[in-house]
Amino acid sequence: MSLNLVSPGVKVREVDLTIGNISGAQEQVGAIAGPFEKGPIDVPILVENEQDLIATYGKPLDKDGQFEYWMTASSYLSYGGTLRVLRSDSSNLNNANAGVSVASTDIKIKSYDDYTSNTYTTFYYAAKNPGTWGNGLKVFTIDHFADQVISGISTTGISVGMGVTQSIKGRVRIGSGTTTSYGDEFVRGIITGVGTAGGVATDAITVKIVDRVTSAGVLSATTYDELKFLSSTTTTTTSSSSVGIGTTAGTVDLPNDITIDGITVSSAGGGMNSNIQLGDVVTVTGGNSIVAAGTTVIGISTTSGIGTVTVDRAITGVSTSGDGAIFTFTRTTTSSSTNNLNQTFIINDSGVGVSTFTSTTASDWYNQQTLGLTKGGDISWNTIAEKPGTSEYAESRGGSNDEIHIVVIDEDGSSSGVAGNILEKHLYLSKAKDGKRQPAEEVYYKNYLANRSELIFNGAHAGATVSGLTAKAGNASVDDFNLVTGGAWGQNASGVTFNVEGNRSYDLTGGKDYSGTDGYLIDKGDVINSYNILKNPAEYSINFILQGPSGGATIFDSQAKASALIGIANLRKDCIACISPHRAGVVNIPNSDTQTDNIVDYYAPLQSSSYAVFDSGYKYTFDRFNNEFRYIPLNGDIGGLMARTSINSFS
């Protein structure tokens, strides 16, 4: 609506009374480039406040004057404007990464576009952008590597890819409102890990349930929730019986004698069924002697079948040959039977038995898995999420074992200040290139990390262990099987049994900053190259170009940088270059006249321009991040004041 106002000095403004103005009605955008701690390289990201600046580009650092760039940006933002920040490039920059064949490799990923434009196979995981900030991060992954651990066995001759079988006869099968018992059937699994190489003890293997085989030899896919391997046990039953050896007459000559004389000690005659042996039990009937219960033979001497027996207890009473003492000998025999329950069989792909175990311990694999942190206390995977398995998307297309969990941890606390802190959790992602969560959320782990993670990219695919087996075609024996190959990650889910890698960790190392390993000295040419990205006014809308620190070791380097920024402003003709003097000309110069002369000398060679503003120095302010007072250039404040004035005047 048109307003015709005739009263002098009256103007109309729309004001939001909740905040006192119209926020964003007149956006004032600054721009700065420099060697920030982290962030994408040469990508002008719009930052609205100091919190965004910290989250995207890190904090000010007390190294090589890096804080001047950061605090200039912060000063501008404090006036209410927004800021396009560019992190400058350097030939020394390197992303922290976990290499494929080495601990880390030389790799620089500048940005998301740089990542998607290239193929990376020399690392498994890398920090999202270059710098030492990524050193110390650890990436942990886990997939459906195994269902159970079978321990207490000898692993000699056993290798990954062999089969495991166990009878399930007599086990109860729960149906819909009914229960039945399995007949002559057995469950099959595949070995995915052996000993310490499989992440378990030297006397253990990891096993994944695959299917069950009916008595008719029919394969039926099954899961760990339906069937599992039970611990193998052996029970021994022992029974005792008493066998009569025979009876024989004998004499006891002394009142408390331990010998019996004149007895038949062999089966040659005299009522004996077999020879008397040590340990036989002796009893007596008739005569005058008393033999204590449990008395046994401990010695035998004989001549022509007639002899003397020595016993372990004294016999009371004397019995002569006419007293009619009859001694009976019996023998206790022991028998035992062994019953093996849930025997576990290891077979190769030809159905040939490799090992048979009668004593094992079967336990859940996932519940034993931890991250393996050495600082801040370890964390169990089952406290983070349930075990990954097969996604609904893959299952509906005949695929399996595609799910994977990925967690990023600050183990030593260098990034977050808390050792063992979980920085990111990416759960139930898919190894399938077309993997989705219904209805259409992409969860292919490589793309998901690229789009959603703030910390890491994926490079090469891991997972080299096959996780399935099937009967050989045309073979009547289901003991003969083929491994299900072709399970590499990064293909469409249809019909693929994806390979597994288990519980893995990846240390990110090798990250480098702008100079040396962790320095921030940067060539002025690299900074100017970043500013040159802003030359096209149709691509990026900006109002103020902030010089930041004067840059360069000499006044000539500083003048070259200032001249380049003024040239960009002159070319665009829609923004102002905010320039501060050479640092060495004003900081720590006690004489104000000398400072003035230095400022004049600095600005004199610079070209005149309607699109540049020169200020006169550096301000002394407190850096709360490093607990120290700093000198920083005023161009951030000058640009901020102009932005604030514009906002107040035209909003």
PLM regions: where:
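A glycine- and small-residue-enriched flexible loop/hinge signal that marks low-structured segments
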Residues: 1-234, 239-245, 336-651
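Polar, enzyme-active/binding microenvironments
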Residues: 194-201, 246-333
